[in-house]
């Protein structure tokens, strides 16, 4: 018999049956705690004696005691037994003496110096070595860390699939200063470094000529480049010099960025290292199979290779014990009881590996490796060492930045005094923590996981950015993207399953593993890992910063590289707010129902094309007060724009090409080349990489305008941003005026073919009914759908060639068969392919019950697809609302009334299932903390309490229906659906019908002068109210 020390009060106090489907070699497993009464545990042959000085604190569920199986709560013990796991027949130490952990594969770590190393890099981590590390590195590199110096750790894999860390020595950081006089610069620098406690690490001052990227200039300035071997010293020195009057440039550029930009390297790709020196195992500073040291000059990048090595991506999910409601990491008893780990090897042939870490015995699960742990502490050590030693390069999960990681790190640090930073890839200056934005930060801010040497991808954040759903629960997203439904388990059932048998814990484990598998499938669906690496490559930033650090850093590093090639240096951002400006506006919609083709044309890459066409940039900007300084410029050398602060000028391309325009031109040319290559590509993997490359370029191009327009950004220039939006508005107005003056005769000249007009429309014409930022909606009256589709491209192309300079381009995007135009950014219509397109429109509130949604959708389908209804809707939209009460309703309109009448009849005769009339609202906090209880779900809570029924817990959704009541408040009508159905309580049919009327009115309002109240009145006028 194999003995577990699953803490009971005496040895072998109770036993759990073995799993039935898959059998172990032993007859049974035992919960056993020999340490409470002085018993000694049997020592496995593979086990060494634990260090007596190390005492481990464990929290044990009381349900592990034989006489308290059904009880909740925990008790604490302290023993010298090190973290332990059980796998099949074996008892394992999580941290054995002969290797770093039970997951480590020491046989792969045969590291020796070689002539050349080909390896792929996925992350770059900056650390600082001091002189006391000299004994651990080669002699010729020691000068780079005396008294201290930067070391860049390049993490990746070799061509033979071994994880590797290449430590690059000799990379410096530098910045620039400008002043009227430099006579005291050397003294000022030394004084500031001494005052701030920084030694002159690799200090070097050099005079050079640079142009400032802060306005148009034809001359360079003498500046000093100050080079150091420490980023913290650079920040302190730059701040100190700025305070005494020096103008500072590029002091916000770290060593990794200098390494990439200065050498034209990449943050993700293949490298060669010449003569790498193997780091002795005793001095290894990274948790990788191999580790080498080299100098910056030994590194060469291979841009031609696009293939990936076999990187490991881990998807994980946790299950927590929440006996008194939703789990809270701050409660000792709300422990983590299971962690599922699904490991997918990118580009590998082997099937993804599923691992379940479980507290307590657990039956075997098919295709899952089950590791059992005596306590949560052992489980956490098992998980942390897996992250560190299994060869994981990327970690994903669902909402892991906001829940799973914070929960795990909270438990580890605050309950067990485990240091998470000991379990990242890096030993020196290691990071592993969750950064949570302070309250009041911009609402889109979210928590970020900082983990040295690991890329974290939270698929919850990815799905929120890419999808538009009513909610973003994993089940909803999986159904939308994968067509799969998640088998869910309520957190209320978790304690019951955990306290049950090993079979019950296996059932819980299956749910846990399932969630991690779904997340891996979502990552594969969106190819997020490839997308973020391609963005990282184009933007010169580490992959781990793509999802967490926003758009600003992407453009900044690219601008830095482009500026460097033309001897510009970037100023530091100015603190303090700049005045705002008017953003993109729209041509106000002419609301109504259009039963005629509506052509939608839009500007391809509007803002990037404006920047290119008008040569907008920091490098071409001339403020009004500075214009007299440039006596060599004529009026034809610059373009003037009237923005809110007065005139602003930009030098034209024939004088100097804008830095931003040059950058955009290079990117877009590269994108065009990639798309051409993509058309010819036959390899599926390479097609995915190329597609993500062109998408990364598109995303980065579209970020340039936003980069200039954020007042608190890295290099804001609101004059550029406002000029861009001004031109966008002007272009929309010009296009509107031009298109509305196009005649049939002129259109035929444009198209070079005969344009057919509908015979019942002797005077065909175009009218712009809406303009939205970069697109125009053109009503094509007197033309058939097929004709509009045929001439759309020609009309758009001709308009852009007549009105605008290259590369501004107008394109035919889509054609609506019919369109309901409500208000700005809100419309519904049927496209030429018969699909319904909705923008900014919720047919009904997302919280509405199923029946209200069904009736509303039925009306929408009728309105968009029934010819009689469409004719009636268009006729009504051209008439005053008051006419509806004076004349007989149109036949098509009566079809809508028939649907409403039928719904009312079904409600009155109780034909609608109660389930379809049910609403639900979350109990977000304890009932007693609500300031008012006159809310439907709280009213039901009170009724359940009065009837002594089981009460919902915090974060439960409380279901309710509305029934007939003598009360005056809506909450008085709320009732528990089960109780209402069992007691045959009549539903509040009039209340539900009113919801239907308002839902339908929300759709039909465009027909009745966009007046929802008037629409409701019209509908009530024609329905049959008993």
UniProtKB/Swiss-Prot annotation:
Replicates viral genomic DNA. PANTHER family: DNA POLYMERASE CATALYTIC SUBUNIT, DNA POLYMERASE DELTA CATALYTIC SUBUNIT. The keyword rRNA-binding does not apply. It is found in: Host nucleus. This is DNA polymerase catalytic subunit. Keywords: Coiled coil, DNA replication, DNA-binding, DNA-directed DNA polymerase, Host nucleus, Nucleotidyltransferase, Transferase, Viral DNA replication. Its EC number is 2.7.7.7. One of its GO terms (molecular function) is nucleotide binding. Belongs to the DNA polymerase type-B family. Residues 664-695 form a coiled coil. GO terms for cellular component: host cell nucleus. GO terms for biological process: DNA-templated DNA replication; viral DNA genome replication. Pfam families: DNA_pol_B, DNA_pol_B_exo1. PROSITE patterns: DNA_POLYMERASE_B. It comes from Alcelaphine herpesvirus 1 (strain C500). It catalyses: DNA(n) + a 2'-deoxyribonucleoside 5'-triphosphate = DNA(n+1) + diphosphate. InterPro entries: DNA-dir_DNA_pol_B, DNA-dir_DNA_pol_B_CS, DNA-dir_DNA_pol_B_exonuc, DNA-dir_DNA_pol_B_multi_dom, DNA/RNA_pol_sf, DNA_pol_B_thumb, DNA_pol_palm_dom_sf, DNA_pol_type-B.
């Amino acid at each position: 018999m194999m003995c577990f020390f699953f803490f009971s009060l005496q040895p072998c106090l109770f036993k759990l049956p073995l799993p039935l489907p898959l059998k172990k070699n032993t007859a049974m497993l035992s919960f056993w705690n020999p340490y409470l009464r002085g018993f000694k545990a049997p020592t496995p042959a593979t086990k060494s004696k634990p260090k007596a000085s190390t005492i481990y604190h464990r929290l044990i569920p009381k349900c592990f005691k034989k006489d308290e199986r059904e009880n909740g709560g925990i008790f604490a013990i302290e023993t010298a037994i090190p973290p332990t796991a059980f796998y099949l027949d074996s008892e394992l130490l999580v941290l054995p003496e002969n290797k770093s952990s039970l997951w480590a594969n020491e046989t792969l770590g045969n590291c020796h110096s070689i002539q050349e190393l080909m390896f792929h890099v996925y992350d770059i981590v900056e650390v600082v070595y001091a002189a006391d590390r000299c004994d651990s590195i080669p002699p010729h590199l020691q000068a780079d860390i005396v008294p201290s110096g930067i070391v860049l750790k390049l993490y990746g894999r070799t061509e033979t699939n071994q994880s590797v860390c290449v430590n690059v020595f000799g990379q410096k950081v530098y910045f620039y200063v400008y002043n009227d006089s430099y006579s005291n610069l050397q003294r000022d620098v030394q004084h500031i470094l001494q005052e701030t406690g920084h030694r002159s690490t690799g200090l070097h001052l050099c005079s050079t000529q640079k142009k400032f990227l802060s306005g148009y200039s034809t001359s360079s300035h003498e500046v000093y480049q100050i080079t150091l071997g420490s980023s913290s010293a650079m920040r302190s020195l730059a701040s100190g010099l700025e305070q005494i009057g020096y103008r500072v440039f590029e002091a916000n550029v770290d060593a990794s960025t200098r390494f990439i930009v200065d050498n034209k390297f990449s943050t993700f790709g293949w490298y060669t290292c010449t003569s790498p020196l193997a780091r002795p195992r005793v001095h290894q500073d990274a948790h990788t199979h191999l580790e080498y040291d080299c100098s910056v000059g030994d590194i060469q990048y291979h841009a031609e290779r696009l293939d990936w090595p076999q990187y490991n991506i881990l998807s994980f999910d946790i299950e927590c014990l929440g006996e008194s409601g939703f789990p809270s990491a701050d409660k000792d008893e709300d422990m983590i009881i299971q962690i599922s780990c699904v490991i997918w090897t990118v580009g590998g042939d082997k099937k993804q590996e599923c691992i379940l870490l479980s507290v307590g015995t657990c039956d075997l699960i098919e295709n899952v490796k089950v590791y059992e742990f005596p306590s949560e502490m052992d489980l956490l050590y098992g998980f942390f060492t897996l992250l560190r030693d299994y060869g994981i390069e990327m970690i994903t999960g669902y909402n892991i930045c906001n829940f799973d990681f914070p929960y795990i790190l909270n438990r580890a640090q605050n309950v067990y005094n485990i240091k998470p930073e000991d379990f990242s890839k890096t030993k020196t200056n290691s990071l592993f923590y969750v950064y949570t934005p302070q309250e009041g930060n911009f609402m889109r801010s979210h928590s970020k996981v900082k983990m040295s040497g690991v890329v974290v991808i939270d698929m919850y954040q990815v799905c929120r950015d890419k999808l538009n759903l009513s909610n973003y629960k994993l089940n909803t997203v999986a159904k939308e993207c994968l067509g799969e439904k998640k088998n869910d388990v309520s957190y209320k059932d978790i304690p019951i399953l955990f306290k049950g048998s090993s079979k019950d814990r296996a059932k819980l484990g299956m749910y846990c593993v399932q969630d991690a598998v779904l997340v891996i499938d979502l990552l594969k669906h969106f190819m997020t890992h490839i997308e973020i690496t391609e963005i990282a490559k184009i933007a010169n930033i580490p992959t781990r910063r793509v999802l967490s650090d926003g758009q600003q850093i992407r453009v900044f590093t690219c601008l830095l590289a482009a500026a460097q090639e033309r001897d510009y240096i970037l100023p530091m951002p100015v603190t303090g707010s700049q005045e705002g400006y008017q953003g993109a506006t729209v041509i106000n919609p002419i609301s109504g129902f259009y039963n005629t083709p509506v052509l939608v044309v839009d500007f391809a890459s509007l803002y990037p094309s404006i920047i290119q066409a008008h040569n907008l940039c920091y490098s071409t900007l001339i403020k009004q007060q500075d214009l007299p300084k440039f006596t060599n410029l004529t009026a034809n050398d610059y373009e003037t724009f009237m923005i809110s602060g007065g005139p602003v000028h930009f030098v034209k391309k024939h004088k100097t090409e804008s830095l931003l325009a040059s950058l955009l031109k290079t990117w877009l040319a590269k994108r065009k080349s990639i798309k051409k290559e993509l058309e010819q590509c036959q390899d599926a993997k390479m097609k995915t990489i190329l597609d993500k490359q062109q998408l990364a370029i598109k995303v980065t191009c579209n970020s340039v305008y936003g980069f200039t327009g954020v007042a608190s950004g890295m290099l804001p220039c609101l004059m550029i941003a406002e000029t861009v939006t001004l031109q966008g508005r002007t272009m929309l107005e010009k296009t509107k005026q031009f298109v509305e003056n196009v005649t049939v005769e002129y259109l035929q000249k444009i198209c070079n073919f005969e344009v057919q007009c509908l015979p019942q429309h002797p005077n065909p014409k175009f009218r712009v009914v809406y303009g939205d930022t970069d697109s125009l909606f053109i009503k094509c009256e007197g033309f058939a759908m097929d004709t509009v589709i045929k001439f759309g491209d020609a009309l758009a192309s001709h308009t852009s060639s007549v009105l605008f300079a290259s590369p501004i381009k107008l394109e035919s995007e889509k054609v609506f068969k019919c369109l309901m135009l409500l208000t700005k950014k809100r419309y519904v219509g049927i496209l030429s392919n018969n699909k319904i397109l909705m923008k900014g429109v919720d047919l009904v509130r997302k919280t509405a019950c199923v029946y209200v949604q069904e009736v509303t959708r039925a009306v929408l389908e009728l309105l968009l697809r029934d010819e009689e209804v469409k004719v009636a809707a268009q006729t009504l939209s051209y008439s005053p609302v008051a006419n509806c009460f004076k004349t007989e309703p149109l036949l098509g309109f009566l079809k809508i009334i028939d649907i409403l009448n039928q719904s009312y009849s079904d409600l009155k005769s109780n034909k609608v299932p109660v389930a379809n009339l049910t609403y639900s609202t979350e109990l977000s906090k304890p009932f007693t903390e609500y300031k008012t209880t006159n809310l439907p779900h709280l009213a039901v809570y009170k009724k359940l309490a009065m009837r002594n029924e089981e009460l919902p817990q915090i974060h439960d959704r409380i279901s309710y229906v509305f029934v007939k009541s003598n009360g005056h408040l809506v909450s008085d009508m709320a009732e528990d659906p089960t109780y209402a159905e069992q007691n045959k309580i009549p539903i509040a049919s009039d209340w539900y019908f009113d919801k239907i009327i308002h839902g339908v009115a929300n759709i039909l309002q465009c027909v009745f002068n966009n007046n929802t109240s008037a629409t409701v009145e019209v509908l009530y006028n024609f329905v049959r109210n008993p």
